Amino acid sequence: MDQLVSAAYATEISLARTAFQNGDYSKCFYHLERAHILGQRSTVKHTYAHWLMFRVGVQQSDFREILGQVPRMLASLLFSRIWVPVGNTGRSRVPAMKVMPIPDDLRHLLQ
């Protein structure tokens, strides 16, 4: 994975952790979604983003998020190196296989 993408991923994870610690779960998910987009091509980073989404779901008692993240974690372990739905934010509220637009400020990192 490109160093710029890895650095941007690490920044998003750090911001998500800070938001989680502050109880700002909406902001936490925002940064986790961005980390997910950046980390999709790395099995470890992709799965870790889903793991953190799962943890936020547990913290919020959001059963839809919890149940949706389990198969996404498994799929990320199996398919990250083969195919990913580019731009997909990784949340349980969006279809797992849906290709989505990449945010403008991240697009240059992934091209």
What positions do the PLM features span?
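Solenoid-repeat scaffolds in large eukaryotic assemblies
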Residues: 25-28, 35, 65-66
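Start-of-helix signal in alpha-solenoid helical-repeat scaffolds, especially tetratricopeptide repeats
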Residues: 2, 6-10, 47
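Alpha-helical junction/boundary sensor with strong preference for TPR arrays
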Residues: 38-39, 77-81
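TPR/TPR-like (Sel1-like) alpha-helical repeat modules
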Residues: 54-79
